[in-house]
Amino acid sequence: MTATIYTTADLQRFIDAHVIQAELLRDIGHTPTVPAAALALGVTPDQIVKTLLFLIEPPGQDAATPVVVISHGERCVDKGRLAVRFAVSKKRVTLAPAAVVLATLGYPAGGVPPFGHHTPLPVIVDASVQALGARHGGVIFAGGGDDCTMMRLTVAWSPLA
């Protein structure tokens, strides 16, 4: 299967089509990690969020279920909590390899944005991201479609009920 590879131009079209208040910051340097992104942007690492793809392997199924997790950049995602959420053992929760990330989401690992993916998937937003809304005026940065582009967003968290 050949992966559909999205570009920053594809992400900008998604942002425009969905009227998302986000700004792509292009050509800021090589930013595949949270520390590199923070350094390139001149911000603290606690302003960076990361978008990760996990594979959940339910017993008795031939294929793993991909799940997107958006987390505070300085935190490790607790695979044990994901396992509980999906009623599987912790060993059945793995971080997707780079080739699977590209084939599933359309963006390379290290530059995955929080939205606009090739394949619509369940998304889990870690509670740590909500807490970012109270700091730095709510301004956060996320992957911008490649490892030289970041996206500037503002966290606005409002319960629906």
Predicted regions and their residues:
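Extended, low-hydrophobicity, polar/charged segments
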Residues: M1-A161
